[in-house]
């Protein structure tokens, strides 16, 4: 970054913002880079500001029982805030004085006051000086207030982040990541620009008092008629605002539903394509879009009427103020024009500035209270341990994650007994809820000597991770004592990678030791991986290590823990993502050898690890099931083995018995969504997280329309969808609605829905920060949105008369009432959705984009012509007013000759009053009617254009090849459907209309003034040209600065999420200060771009004002010096001149807004223009013998349910297959060739990242491929993509459950009747799972099916494959994270339903591979071996290395003799089961 010219700028340069000219020049000539941005001053640095506020907040905490954050802010910023408020007030006072001078100028042309004609020139000079004074007062004041708001935001950002790192885990379990992002983005954005409006809470009343005093002098009591009308108008607009909110509320639920489905589609686009669900998803989303658009139109119409009412009210304000006075006493022209000018200022103060100011204070104080509450939450306390011992001792330790759970349980029990539960299985309710009534750990006793290895095992939710958290001090014991040496190193169950190099991630701030580092790298099997990178271990990893495989991330996390020299190492399931061979090598070389002299506590689920551990602790439901050695385990706990053995007899049970066992076993996991498998904390479940049963669950999702729009979400909950009534409460955070035409809803993006364990529980579920840290969150069906990109400038809803820049700014800000971010957000994708990648879209929207947009709908051009025709009609109506003046001039002369010395010349007399009244009202009504006719068709048509563009973009994304989609972030795609479509729906129609109307008003006014004084036209032309040139000059730089600001905003939030995910690791390593420094750097980077944007914007606005002042000086003196008799002409010219330039100033700003919004259209067009998948693959369809291909075409078009001729056997032949993820990328698979016979089962073997899953994707034509694949002799080039994929059944690695009913999830095309679906559900053991929910097949699943365990979801995928009647089945890690019983269910179903099918299986479990006849071994992207298991075991191979000799002797009987099959499976289960303890008692 460069040094800022502001440091050496003169006072004049600072006053006129001339120091920004260098960056404006550079931005106009070339594309700006981050290096071009100026450095911030020390006063704006996050370090200084946070230190200053933190000092005052600590002082507030120490001195008072009830500390107030606003007091700390006041001590930091009050005097500067007050100073700029006074400047702002003085600038506003000049607006009230201007009409006085205007009246005096008009009065100087009074025929009876010829003596005053000589002072007109001086009055003109005074009027011009007032404009200059206003410019010099307002702009520094606005900029200063923006600057203070920015500093407040930075200081609070830092304070919140520091507090986040200190929060206790119990508090973090109650806070969602969305709440934290809301504090940082939504609440704090209110300070950034809203601070400039805060002073109007006292300025506006003073302004009204001053204006009413001046109007009283002119019109006496009649002036209050106009004020009363303005108050009524404000109330009317508030009513219209509430009506609009009603439509917004209704519409928000539909937007939510659409975006939930859309996000699920995008996140699982590979599964959608694999299942051939493109048409079903498109139809589903478009149906929701239709309903949404009906409500969008209604809201847009009300909003249009609202803003139009404000604009056209100008006629009636003046009319009602003047009429009573005129009827009683008559009125002169001077008073009319002066009244018009006063009423314009008065109307702005009453209907805009004061409501906005109250709203700003209401929002700001609410935000401060939220932040204050957050800053007072309980902090993490490091427990005081006995530092003299080198052992770990726990004595009768009991702990709860949630305090007061017993009371919560009793309340739930009372609710249940009182009959609040409408229907359903009560046993289900209590079997789930009983988990919460017990402590997470209870009566734990163990002792580990120095250098020993303690293996901790147990079923899911047994409390294994909680045990480690207890040792780390994250969980405080309720009873008992803990002792250990205190120096801890920790490896999380889910790998955490910070942005930086591999080396930085491993060293993690510890002093570098070359020998130790190399030893750790070798022991953690990272040498080979690092050697593949060109930069070796200096390769920079993205946030979360997204460029690495899961296994690589896990090994880096383990290496970080091992590298630190500690007394105690806590390893929480570090081998979860490793293949069998790698896991075996790391356990032996790293855990057993390298760390042999260290005390280690290892959470594991492997029998081999238990054998080699010095001590074993088995937990079951929070209690110690066993503590001792492995030999003692076999002797003292024989039931531990018998339970495993019992699983082998599972197939012998009846179907009802199997379903009962399955339901009872999985029921324990169903509460935590995907918490089955290795996720360890289902005790910290939704009941506890909600805090209380009746709490209304908040919205999830970061608003995609960053700082543009707010929507209120009111959506049917799943209970309501399923026919169960729910008590709805008004949200406690409803906003005070004072600004009638602002969008005061909540957010537009989806809400996760109710927990649905049946009809028995009406509590709410949300993802807490603790769940983010433990990854026990639902990672499907959630949305971010997304985007905290740079604010698009705010839009006007209606043209304004005689607006100052402050009025314009205020109006713009009203459309940005703050980004109301809801309580939740999808943590998994937050990093992707905070900003869009820097896209190849020009800084200024091209004319081609405008042309394409106009031609999207054939009627749009005609509507634009219609607007022009209406405009001409309005001009004609305006001529009536001038005719009126002309008609009254003779009467004026007559009246003046008949008048006495005490009577002024009048326009309206008692004899002509009613005649003039009817003409005036007629003109006003005509303009009102014409205005409505002009705008509504345009708004209606532009919303239709948005509908068409959404349809085209949705179709394009669904049918785009994966190679194209792989180059895009999910968040970037989702932003197109959320942020950009919302802009097209809401902002763009009214903003385009606004711009067109403003331009036409300016043209019309210039024409009228030029007709009255042709010389003024000569002055207007160069001024308009200057405006256009200035706009083009500024726009190039401003758009680039906003783009850089957007990029600078992203690291702030990604750093927050990164820190939260690794918070336990940060604390264990003591790296909080380092991460605070990184956060401050991110803040400073964003501050530099935002401050420069504010400065250049102020430069632009000030230059507009300066041009306006020059023009007004010219108009004033031309009109004064060239006008003879006729006060009316001078009044019209000066009044219109003031109106022209303020309107033209706003028109220029509006054009910038339109250009900014049209960038959303450019991005939508970019997605519409993506290549289609079919065109990429389709070649001429070759005829096939016996008409087989034509029957395939029937399958494609009609989704026939009967068995089709192709494929009939399932034979697969692959020749020279090469696959790439993206065009031009590296080959993931090279020259793969093999063949599979019909009905054969083939297992894929290979290390993590070798390309097994990639091969399955290539078979489905999801990648860029070369070579040939044939199924039953039919080449993939001779059939369509859809036909090809329907030949395969798929169980993907990432399970896809979209928001919808069970029926829709199993059969989205509606091909099968209920009888057939229930039959398949019986086959796969899914019936009892579905029957426990109300509505059965019609029960609505939400949030990626969070009420289902991972096992349930795998069964859903299995049922889909059975329904597909496919002859080829592809399975990608189907047993991942499954408990033994569900695993046995899936094995049995696969044997029965797919007995005659060809199966390709990618699996890490050795037992699962035993069903395969042949194995395909993939190494280094190529096929190394393709043989039977016996052949592979007899040769040196990867498969042989993974199996020990003793295991081989046990496995062979399974293949050679059916009599010994049972015993072999028992042995395999003993060795490989991931859950050692399962309670299957019914």
Curated annotation (Swiss-Prot):
ATP 2 binds at residues 1221, 1246-1253. Residues 423-646, 1212-1445 form the ABC transporter domain. It comes from Rhinolophus ferrumequinum. Residues 1388-1482 are annotated as: Interaction with GORASP2. There is a cross-link at residue 688 (Glycyl lysine isopeptide (Lys-Gly) (interchain with G-Cter in ubiquitin)). Residues 81-365, 860-1156 form the ABC transmembrane type-1 domain. Binds and hydrolyzes ATP via the two cytoplasmic ABC transporter nucleotide-binding domains. The two ATP-binding domains interact with each other, forming a head-to-tail dimer. Normal ATPase activity requires interaction between the two domains. The first ABC transporter nucleotide-binding domain has no ATPase activity by itself. This is Cystic fibrosis transmembrane conductance regulator. Residues 1-77, 147-195, 244-298, 359-859, 941-991, 1036-1096, 1153-1482 are cytoplasmic.
